[in-house]
């Protein structure tokens, strides 16, 4: 309640909701935004996205219900609950992954495919090789998207710095302002401790 105003014997209440957050796909046509719903309709891609959101919400609600049942089951030990919850989590993420893969296959060059590709590239355990396989399924428009190129660049950096991989050489300056490279020290037959200090 923001305020109440009395005027001419009537009391009027002004209520300003805190915030609305409704995403939509900008496309030609009349986009209908129902603020009580989780999506928009009225245009082809927005209507498809809203339907997919409803399906996912139902799936998520089912998974949450099953999770609460496991947590409340007094006949299961803590270890058995942990195993059951992990199995449920694995099933849930496998389903989400398969739905996103299907969305990318059906929509390789539009906003629904972009959302699916972002979801897939953000999943735990994604590797550069699996990301590149996903990019092969995506259209040029999706592959050129700035967010997608940033996600793939991050995966490239992660792969380049994996434990056991050849170090990534870089240059800095020492206390005497002399240029030094990591390769000046690494690979000389001794242990090297590198301390990064940012000020």
Task: Label each residue range with its predicted role.
Residues 1-98:
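A non-transmembrane, solvent-exposed segment enriched in polar/low-complexity residues
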Residues 11-21, 31-32, 42-46, 82, ...:
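N-terminal targeting signals for export/organelle localization
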Residues 31-33, 179, 189:
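A broad, structure-centric signal for solvent-exposed, well-ordered loop/edge residues
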Residues 76-86, 124, 162-169, 197-199:
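A short, terminal or domain-edge coil/loop segment
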Residues 181-199:
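Short active-site neighborhood of thiol/selenol oxidoreductases, capturing the structured segment around
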């Amino acid at each position: 309640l923001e305020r109440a105003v009395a005027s001419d014997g009537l009391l009027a209440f002004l209520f300003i909701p805190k915030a609305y957050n409704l995403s939509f796909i900008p496309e030609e046509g009349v986009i209908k935004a129902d603020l009580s719903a989780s999506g928009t309709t009225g245009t082809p891609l927005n209507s498809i996205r809203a339907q997919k959101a409803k399906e996912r919400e139902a799936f998520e609600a089912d998974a949450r219900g099953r999770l609460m049942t496991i947590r409340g089951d007094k006949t299961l030990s803590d270890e058995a609950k942990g195993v059951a919850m992990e199995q449920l989590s694995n099933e849930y993420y496998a389903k989400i992954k398969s739905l996103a893969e299907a969305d990318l296959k059906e929509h390789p060059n539009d906003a629904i495919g972009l959302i699916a590709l972002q979801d897939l590239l953000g999943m735990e355990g994604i590797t550069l090789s699996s990301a590149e396989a996903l990019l092969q399924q995506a259209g040029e428009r999706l592959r050129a998207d700035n967010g997608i190129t940033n996600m793939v660049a991050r995966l490239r950096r992660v792969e380049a710095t994996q434990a056991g991989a050849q170090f990534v050489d870089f240059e800095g300056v020492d206390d005497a302002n002399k240029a030094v490279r990591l390769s000046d020290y690494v690979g000389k037959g001794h242990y090297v401790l590198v301390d990064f200090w940012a000020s």
